[in-house]
Structure formats: structure tokens, C-alpha cells
């Protein structure tokens, strides 16, 4: 996993986003055991407290659960994962639409560009 961070937002928030993306994309499948806080903190080169805070946020969102003395796991509730996936997709779409509108494109023009892009992708 790419653990590069930027200064635009807190590191724990970026960790949450990266792990969430791994979960909703299936890289971390339902029921998968996650590495320990210390191991992941060392891997990402962040403070264990930062990693712990990210895990707490993921638990609060229902994407991760803890089992006493066994560790943390990705939820097995596929509905929660799908809802998180839809929410992330909505954020991406809103960001894309805002950027395209700033470039001066209308909704129809954006749709046309997307259709063109899809056709090019098929070729």
C-alpha cells in the first residue's frame, strides 16, 4: 500500500481513507485480519497513536471490528462496505464535477466527455 501523505489534511484521516479504499476495492476482503497497530505504524512510518486513531475511526464507521486478544478485522457486513463504497464514489463524482464546472463545462458537456472517454477506453 502506498503510504505517502500530504500536508493538506491530518495523517490519521489520510490513513482512514487509504484503508477504507483498500476495503471497498476488495484489496482487504471481508473478514481479513489487519496488521497490528505497531506493525502498520512502522510500515507507514507514523506514530502508533496516529494509527490507533485511524483504526478507531474505521471501527466507528463499522468497517473494522476488534476481537479481544485476537486483533482487528475487516467487517464481514457487505452492506456496510457497499455503503462506504457508494459514499466514496459520490465524493469522487462531486469533486470531479466541481473541477469540470470550474473549467467551464456544462453538465451535458461533461456527460459527452465521459462517453467519449468510455469509447476510447473500449478501443
Where in this protein do the model-derived segments appear?
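Short, mixed-charge, low-aromatic patches
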Residues: 8-14, 46-56, 67-73
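Extreme N-terminal segment that seeds HTH/winged-HTH DNA-binding domains in transcriptional regulators
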Residues: 1-33, 87, 91-123
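Short secondary-structure transition/capping segments
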Residues: 44, 78-79, 120-122
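Short glycine/serine/threonine-biased micro-segments
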Residues: 24, 29, 60, 67-69
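Short, Lys/Arg-rich nucleic-acid/phosphate-binding segment
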Residues: 34, 66-74, 78-79
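Short secondary-structure capping/turn micro-motifs that flank functional sites
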Residues: 39, 74-75, 116-117
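N-terminal helix-turn-helix
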Residues: 33-65
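Short, charged/polar, Gly/Pro-enriched secondary-structure boundary elements
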Residues: 80-85
Amino acid at each position: 500500500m502506498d503510504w505517502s501523505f500530504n500536508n493538506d489534511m491530518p495523517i490519521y484521516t489520510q490513513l482512514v481513507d487509504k484503508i477504507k479504499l483498500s476495503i471497498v476495492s476488495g484489496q482487504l476482503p471481508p473478514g481479513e485480519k489487519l496488521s497490528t497497530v505497531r506493525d502498520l505504524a512502522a510500515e507507514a512510518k507514523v506514530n502508533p497513536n496516529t494509527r490507533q486513531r485511524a483504526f478507531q475511526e474505521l471501527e466507528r464507521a463499522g468497517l473494522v471490528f476488534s476481537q479481544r486478544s485476537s486483533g482487528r478485522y475487516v467487517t464481514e457486513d457487505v452492506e456496510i462496505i457497499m455503503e462506504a463504497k457508494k459514499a466514496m464514489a459520490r465524493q469522487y463524482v462531486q469533486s470531479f464535477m466541481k473541477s469540470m464546472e470550474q473549467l467551464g463545462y456544462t453538465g451535458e458537456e461533461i456527460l459527452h466527455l465521459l462517453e467519449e472517454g468510455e469509447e476510447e477506453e473500449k478501443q
